[in-house]
Amino acid sequence: DIDVKGKIYFKESDTLSSGNKVTIAKTDFGKVGIGICYDIRFPELAKLMAEAGAQILFYPGAFNMTTGPAHWELTFRSRALDNQVYCVGVAPALNKDASYHSYGHSIIANPWGEVIVQLDEQENMEIAEIDLEEIKKVRTELPLLKNKRSDLYKINLI
């Protein structure tokens, strides 16, 4: 749901319902995590998928013309960098005749947090090669997951 005063009001929860589990799929090349549009905003969900062995996180999504320019690239780069995985956002093209205007800009961010593919708002397609060895390389160079201190991430009330 979104309510940015003077820009956009849209209540997805009136038509969509939330899921109740983390989705990991085994493929011929490895595990992938699958979320949907709004899920990209929750770092904990991406972390759970990465910790379950997902090497690529897929998020089909349709950010709008307010949140898209502000957050689309930033969130995909962040989730990729945080978890040292590939993060793929697949978006519909902008249709100015539709009642909802999607930002478009399908994107792939690599484990270093760099954008390796980003389309514009037009209907388009691009084929990109994803090198899963890059994940191992980045995790060796910057061992974030290895050095994570999960033991400290608990709140003890006193």
Where are the regions a protein language model picked out?
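Short loop segments at secondary-structure junctions
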Residues: 28-29, 111-113, 131-133
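Intrinsically disordered, low-complexity N-terminal regions enriched in serine/proline/glycine
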Residues: 8, 37, 99-102, 152
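Structured C-terminal cap/extension of enzyme domains
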Residues: 121-123, 130-131, 137-138
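Active-site catalytic loop in hydrolytic enzyme cores
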Residues: 1-52, 65-74, 141-144
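CN hydrolase (nitrilase-like) catalytic-core segments centered on the catalytic cysteine
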Residues: 41-126
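Short, well-ordered beta-strand micro-motif
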Residues: 24-26, 108, 127-129
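Generic alpha-helical secondary structure signal
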Residues: 70, 74, 133-136, 151
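A short C-terminal boundary segment appended to hydrolase-like catalytic domains
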Residues: 136-158
